[in-house]
From Swiss-Prot:
This is Dolichol phosphate-mannose biosynthesis regulatory protein. One of its GO terms (molecular function) is enzyme regulator activity. PANTHER family: DOLICHOL PHOSPHATE-MANNOSE BIOSYNTHESIS REGULATORY PROTEIN. InterPro entries: DPM2 (IPR009914). It comes from Homo sapiens (Human). Keywords: Congenital disorder of glycosylation, Congenital muscular dystrophy, Disease variant, Dystroglycanopathy, Endoplasmic reticulum, Membrane, Transmembrane, Transmembrane helix. Regulates the biosynthesis of dolichol phosphate-mannose. Regulatory subunit of the dolichol-phosphate mannose (DPM) synthase complex; essential for the ER localization and stable expression of DPM1. Part of the glycosylphosphatidylinositol-N-acetylglucosaminyltransferase (GPI-GnT) complex that catalyzes the transfer of N-acetylglucosamine from UDP-N-acetylglucosamine to phosphatidylinositol and participates in the first step of GPI biosynthesis. May act by regulating the GPI-GNT complex. The chain crosses the membrane at residues 11-31, 49-69. One of its GO terms (biological process) is protein glycosylation. Belongs to the DPM2 family. The keyword Transmembrane helix applies. It is a multi-pass membrane protein. It comes from the Eukaryota. Component of the dolichol-phosphate mannose (DPM) synthase complex composed of DPM1, DPM2 and DPM3; in the complex interacts directly with DPM3. Component of the glycosylphosphatidylinositol-N-acetylglucosaminyltransferase (GPI-GnT) complex composed at least by PIGA, PIGC, PIGH, PIGP, PIGQ, PIGY and DPM2. Interacts with PIGA, PIGC and PIGQ.
């Protein structure tokens, strides 16, 4: 069973994810249909970042997954050599 702290952290992560999803959805899907002179545009980054930010996040994710897999494989190889 999860402790109270785990539940609070989980709820916080869900809340942050929901806020990011709502912001990004409004930015990418709704904003192009609103007049460019409308005041709401000042609350959003330029459209070029709508592609650049997720691309950079995806590349960082792939980098960390690759590093983790490499680390685990090298560690397993060392343990196997010591056992022999």
């Amino acid at each position: 069973m999860a402790t109270g702290t785990d539940q609070v952290v989980g709820l916080g992560l869900v809340a942050v994810s929901l806020i990011i999803f709502t912001y990004y959805t409004a930015w990418v899907i709704l904003l192009p249909f609103i007049d460019s002179q409308h005041v709401i545009h000042k609350y959003f980054l330029p459209r070029a970042y709508a592609v650049a930010i997720p691309l950079a996040a995806g590349l960082l994710l792939l980098l960390f997954v690759g590093l983790f897999i490499s680390y685990v494989m090298l560690k397993t190889k060392r343990v196997t050599k010591k056992a022999q």
